[in-house]
Amino acid sequence: MSWQTYVDDHLMCDIEGTGQHLTAAAILGLDGTVWAKSDKFPEFKPEEMKGIINEFNEVGTLAPTGLFLGGAKYMVLQGEAGAVIRGKKGAGGICIKKTGQAMVMGIYDEPVAPGQCNMIVERLGDYLVDQNM
């Protein structure tokens, strides 16, 4: 299965039969290279990705400044140290799950709830961890 198929079929899927979808999603390498992404996934700056990668290695580094992706600023929420970063921006937010070799990212806006985004992103991330990816 291609990385794009994971994004299209497992991240941008219909959420629990509601007809709702994440706004954007991507799978990136731990060096910040894009492996696959949805059409609306934002273009990001290298320093934004560096900040995200740093947060996984040194938890708490993004809390004072916020998480930036594609110029959008997210307030960092409680995640799982070294494994999950969650952020909030207005009525939407972001969830990032780190695996052994990749980062799975999902961005949502209302009416999608934070928990729905977290479930989709973390479920695929957990599967990839189980596959030693």
UniProtKB/Swiss-Prot annotation:
InterPro entries: PFN, PFN_euk, PFN_sf, Profilin_CS. Binds to actin and affects the structure of the cytoskeleton. At high concentrations, profilin prevents the polymerization of actin, whereas it enhances it at low concentrations. By binding to PIP2, it inhibits the formation of IP3 and DG. GO terms for cellular component: cell cortex; cytoskeleton. The keyword Plastid does not apply. Gene3D superfamilies: Dynein light chain 2a, cytoplasmic (3.30.450.30). This is Profilin-2. Disulfide bonds: none annotated. Keywords: Actin-binding, Allergen, Cytoplasm, Cytoskeleton.
